[in-house]
Amino acid sequence: METLLNNIGLSFTLCKFIPYLHTILIGIVCAKLLSKHISASKIIRNIFITLITILPFGIYFAINPIFQGDFSNEGVLIKKKLELPKNNDLLIIALADCPYCIQSQETVKLIHQKNTKIKAEYLIVNGTKQDSIKYARMLNGFASCRTIKNSVPLIQTIQGSFPSFILVQNSTFKKVWNNNTFSVRAWDEVVSCIE
């Protein structure tokens, strides 16, 4: 359902929130309809109505749980001077064999589909030319890729967390998110910041 809502053009936050709201409404409607047909004591009837009300939400939540960072936007403003390319809108700091870094390409692809003007680039820390080629194949043209050398200011800025996402506006590093805080609200911020 999130994919369908995303394809319609809703914000990432609404795409994540609406299915949960929808399941609650389904539960309320089902409980209202079924409550008329229950001929039991008031306590049993109330327990049954409560269970029917929360059941759709519970099932959807079991399949698609809400994680701690799903609705957060806890990016950190960048105050350090970094020696990174400034000609992109979104920089993704990654490690060559990090599974979360590789997974992040799906997120970047969704962001790029929402706003095709966004120029994203993967910077593979201490990677080889082969790592860069591997990422470039996976990225399939929606982001560029290159290797960079590790630096103390960079590691301090991203707090040693990979992947990390850096928003660049007007050649200025604005905000950094780690993988746990780069959620739908952050995605919306990135999409809306780039004209």
Set out the residue ranges of the language-model regions.
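Membrane-embedded alpha-helical segments of integral membrane proteins
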Residues: 1-36
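Internal/C-terminal transmembrane anchor helices
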Residues: 42-66
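Alpha-helical transmembrane signal-anchor/signal-peptide segments
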Residues: 66-82
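Short active-site neighborhood of thiol/selenol oxidoreductases, capturing the structured segment around
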Residues: 83-102, 108, 114-117
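Mature, folded catalytic cores of secreted/periplasmic enzymes
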Residues: 89, 108-118, 134-136, 160-162, ...
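Structural motif
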Residues: 93-97, 125-128, 169, 178-180
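Thiol-based oxidoreductase modules, predominantly thioredoxin-like and allied folds used
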Residues: 117-134, 140-152
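Thiol/disulfide oxidoreductase modules built on the thioredoxin-like
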Residues: 150-194
